[in-house]
Amino acid sequence: EMFLNLGPQHQYTHGVLRVVLKLDGERVVDLDPVLGYLHRGVEKLCENADYHHVISQVDPLEYVSGLFNEWAPVMAFEQLLDVQVPRRAEYIRVLSAELLRVSSHSLFLGWMALDLGGLTPILWSFIERDEIIEMLASLTGQRMLFNYFRIGGVNGDLNHEFMSRLGSWMSRAAT
C-alpha cells in the first residue's frame, strides 16, 4: 500500500487540483480529491465593495475566459435591480464571450496534446489565443482582465479596429 500525491499544480496553470492516490502496486484503490487551490478570498473582498467593483474582482478567477466571470454577477445585479439590457449590448456580450470560449477550447486542446507528449499544438493554440486576445483588447482596452461588462450593458460599443480584426479572423478560421 502506497500513497501518491498528484499535484497540487500551480493556480495559474491548467490544473488547480490535488489528488491523493492510494495504490496497491500499480492499481489505484482509492483517491481523495483536495479542492480549494484556486480560492483567493474574493467573497470577502466583495462584501465591502459596491456592485461595479465586484465585476472587476471576479475577472482573475478564471484568467482564460474572464468575461464569463463578469457575466454572472452582472446578470444577478440586473435581475435584482430590474434593469433591461439593450439587445445590442446582449449581442456584444455573447460575441465577446464566445470568442473567449474559442480561445479557451483551443488552449484546452493544446494543453491536452502537451500532456500526451505533443509540443506543436500548444504553440498553435497560444498563437490562436493571442490573436483573439488582441482582438478583444482592441474592444475592451485590456488584454487579460477585461472589466468590460457593466450593469445594463457593456463598456463601449463595437469599434472599427475590432470589427476589422474579427472579419480577418473569421475569414481565416473558415478555411
Residue ranges and their predicted role:
Residues 1-18, 22-175:
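Active-site bordering "gate/hinge" segments
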